[in-house]
From Swiss-Prot:
It comes from Bombus lapidarius (Red-tailed bumblebee). Its main location: secreted. GO terms for molecular function: toxin activity. GO terms for cellular component: extracellular region. It comes from the Eukaryota. One of its GO terms (biological process) is killing of cells of another organism. Mast cell degranulating peptide. May also display antibacterial and antifungal activities. Its mast cell degranulation activity may be related to the activation of G-protein coupled receptors in mast cells as well as interaction with other proteins located in cell endosomal membranes in the mast cells. It is found in: Secreted. Expressed by the venom gland. This is Bombolitin-7. Keywords: Antibiotic, Antimicrobial, Fungicide, G-protein coupled receptor impairing toxin, Immunity, Innate immunity, Mast cell degranulation, Secreted, Toxin. Belongs to the MCD family. Bombolitin subfamily. The keyword Mitochondrion does not apply.
């Protein structure tokens, strides 16, 4: 996995947790 892909997944997970 590329760093960009990992960061993208992290952002998605954080966005779901913030809801």
């Amino acid at each position: 996995l590329k760093l960009k892909d990992i960061l993208g997944k992290i952002k998605v997970i954080l966005s779901h947790l913030n809801k």
